[in-house]
Amino acid sequence: MIGNARMSQKYPTSSSRKRSPLSSGKYSAIGLLAYCRPGFEAECAQELQNIASLQFVYGYSKIDKGTGVVFWRCSQGNPLDVYKEIEVSRCIFARQVFCALHDIEIEDTTDRVSPVVEALRPGGAFGFLHIETPLEDEAGSLQKLAKKLTAPMSAALRNAGVLSKAKTDELPQLHLVCLSGQHIIAALAVHPNSSALPLGIPRLRFRNEAPSRSALKIEEAFLTMLTPAEREFVLKRGQRGVDLGAAPGGWTWYMVTQGVKMTAVDHGALQQELLEDPAVTYVSDDGYVYKPQRKVDWVVCDIVDKPKRTMERMADWLCYDWTTYALFNLKLPMKTRMDEVEACLQRLQERLLGADIESEVRVKQLYHDREEVTVLALTGHFLTAFQKH
């Protein structure tokens, strides 16, 4: 936190939450396991290392490019200390993070259960078992293996006292991650350090009346970047908003479904049904030039352009008090993606500080994002309603 601009920390901690299930047993960790968008493994690995460095814990990452999996192996310090300070919803590139306990190589594929039980027997207990794979193969063999292992593995772990007889949130969850038929990583998870969503992915249903699939992107942003209470506070019926670069109207359509009256700004064509909607005002203009006639509650923007240009325009909207909240995407270059994100956030922070605007800024690469990240900027009464320390 710098000055009086309350930007959310790059890697916010979870130390203020209630007593963690991790205090219920003894767990020995070897590192962190994270899932991210395939192709962004290097950025995710850098993010994990940055988080660990804040706790004076160090290690190295094992990356298989294109898999969306990062295994960060600790070489100095306790990775459990790092995991306790992670809140995955505040990570940028990691969509799921576990605390890795054991890296298990299966020598005899006729018995995958015994090596796992033997590795876990000396440690703490778990309240629930998930067997999963983040990897996709054409035959779905790993998914089938995970399903096949669940019943015998659960029974064996219960008999060994590793898994509780009944599901409980009082203990961490055990995740057995199948990276191949002979390679399993045993990891623990507690919420909100880890995502409660399978593989960290929200399962959203595309509605045929939506103008484009980008509607899923903005829906995911509101569902995952805000808590239910926060969402209820900032997104209300009767609000007014502006969608810059709106065509064909996916983001405008979603905001209208939430009861927000929208001004859709674009030289391109809007979906005909939206043009006829009384809650939508269409303005044929450049999204980077348009100025509102009066302050609105929301500005949203998904324009494909250089990230610094988008960020500067969004900073204008916030600093000139044209809007209370902003949700926008930054399209990232093929190289130096982490550097680009950090540079944009630093510049936004400078602009907000210069305008003496207190804010909270959250950044996330969503499942429905591509070569981009989504930024949520919150100002006004939100900051007093949801004090963060």
From Swiss-Prot:
Subcellular location, principal: cytoplasm
EC number(s) given by UniProt: 2.1.1.186
MF term (GO), any: S-adenosylmethionine-dependent methyltransferase activity
Annotated localization: Cytoplasm
Gene Ontology CC terms: cytoplasm
Segments of skewed composition (Polar residues): 1-13
Catalysis: reaction(s): cytidine(2498) in 23S rRNA + S-adenosyl-L-methionine = 2'-O-methylcytidine(2498) in 23S rRNA + S-adenosyl-L-homocysteine + H(+)
A Pfam short name: FtsJ
GO BP field: methylation; rRNA processing
Positions annotated as active site in the UniProt record: K331 (proton acceptor)
Enzyme class, UniProt record, top EC level: transferase
Chain residue ranges for the region called Disordered: 1-24
Keywords, alphabetical: Cytoplasm, Methyltransferase, rRNA processing, S-adenosyl-L-methionine, Transferase
Sites where the protein binds S-adenosyl-L-methionine: S214, A247, P248, G249, G250, D266, D286, D302
Record's signal peptide: none
Subunit text: Monomer.
Family: Belongs to the class I-like SAM-binding methyltransferase superfamily. RNA methyltransferase RlmE family. RlmM subfamily.
Known function: Catalyzes the 2'-O-methylation at nucleotide C2498 in 23S rRNA.
Entries under HAMAP family matching the protein: 23SrRNA_methyltr_M (MF_01551)
The protein, known as: Ribosomal RNA large subunit methyltransferase M
Gene source species: Hahella chejuensis (strain KCTC 2396)
